[in-house]
């Protein structure tokens, strides 16, 4: 039957065709989310592709479980994630680290995800008991790795707490010594006088030591070299620098040694 609305001699247009790929099955959300998670360069320190882009590696198990899994899958169960990988045919290819591979899960080949099919729970070549044993072995391995990671975190936390306790203990000890020092200084004027004598003695010892060191250093230069430095004006500058260094050494020794000795329990007891 001719179409009355078409001009004479014109062929009718071809019927509409379905869009290419319209009826193709989209990859499962688990595979899509896993691909996006592995492909994100911002989290390469946690999970990333291997060098060849044929597998992915979980580098930081703790961060992967506590940060990435909740972000993409709304849970933090690494064992559950491993079970999902197994159902889609992924295999663990490295015994010493969490590295997984699938022939259709490749870097830059997102379109291949649709080829990954979910495996049937039972196949004719395997018995239910055999599959259950393999699943239990994989879960045991996952749990053992999680235990190792938790123990490492626990050890790190213990070391940090111990260091903080030592710092607090040292601060409290210095506070007690300072309070004892101030109390005795207020009660006995002779106490302060004796401490000042100790300080002067300490300064004199340091000055004598520094003078001896300078003399030994100067003796290594000939009189002609010293005279040449004096004529060029470097001798005075050298002496000024030596005096500044000497003053810094004395102040540092007093800060590091004198007050540490002064605030010690033995020193406070001997001056009382």
Curated annotation (Swiss-Prot):
- Which purpose does this protein serve, as stated in its record? Transcriptional activator that specifically binds DNA sequence 5'-AGAAnnTTCT-3' known as heat shock promoter elements (HSE).
Q: What is its main location?
A: nucleus
| Record's comment on post-translational modification | Exhibits temperature-dependent phosphorylation.
Q: Which family does it belong to?
A: Belongs to the HSF family. Class A subfamily.
- The protein here is known as Heat stress transcription factor A-7a
What does the comment on domains in this protein's record state? The hydrophobic-rich region (HR-A/B) corresponds to the oligomerization domain. AHA motif is a transcriptional activator element.
Region ranges (Disordered): 1-26, 203-223
Q: Give the record's GO CC terms.
A: nucleus
Please name the SUPFAM superfamilies in this protein's record.
Winged helix' DNA-binding domain
Q: Which GO terms describe its biological process?
A: response to heat
InterPro entries this protein is in?
A: HSF_DNA-bd, WH-like_DNA-bd_sf, WH_DNA-bd_sf
Q: Which Gene Ontology terms cover its molecular function?
A: DNA-binding transcription factor activity; transcription cis-regulatory region binding
Region: Hydrophobic repeat HR-A/B, residue numbers: 132-186
Point to the regions of Basic and acidic residues compositional bias. 203-212
Q: Where is this motif: AHA?
A: 256-265
- Record organism: Arabidopsis thaliana
């Amino acid at each position: 039957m001719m179409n009355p609305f078409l001009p004479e001699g014109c062929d009718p247009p071809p019927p509409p065709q379905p869009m290419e790929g319209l009826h193709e099955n989209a990859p499962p959300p688990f595979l899509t989310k896993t691909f996006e998670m592995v492909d994100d360069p911002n989290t390469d320190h946690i999970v990333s592709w291997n060098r060849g882009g044929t597998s992915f590696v979980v580098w930081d198990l703790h961060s992967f479980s506590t940060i990435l899994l909740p972000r993409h899958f709304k849970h933090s169960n690494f064992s559950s994630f491993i079970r999902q990988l197994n159902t889609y045919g992924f295999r663990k290819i490295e015994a010493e680290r969490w590295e997984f591979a699938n022939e259709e899960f490749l870097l830059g080949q997102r379109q291949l995800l649709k080829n990954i099919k979910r495996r049937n729970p039972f196949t004719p070549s395997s018995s239910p008991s055999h599959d259950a044993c393999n699943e239990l072995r994989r879960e045991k391995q996952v749990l053992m790795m999680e235990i190792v990671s938790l123990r490492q975190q626990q050890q790190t936390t213990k070391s940090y707490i111990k260091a903080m306790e030592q710092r607090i203990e040292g601060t409290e000890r210095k506070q007690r010594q300072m309070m004892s020092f101030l109390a005795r200084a207020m009660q006995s004027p002779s106490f302060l006088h004796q401490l000042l004598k100790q300080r002067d003695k300490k300064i004199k010892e340091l000055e004598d030591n520094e003078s001896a060191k300078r003399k030994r250093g100067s003796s290594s230069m000939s009189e002609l070299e010293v005279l040449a430095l004096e004529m060029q004006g470097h001798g005075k500058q050298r002496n000024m620098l030596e005096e500044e260094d000497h003053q810094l050494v004395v102040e540092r020794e007093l800060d590091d040694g004198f007050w540490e000795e002064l605030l010690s329990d033995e020193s406070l007891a001997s001056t009382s």
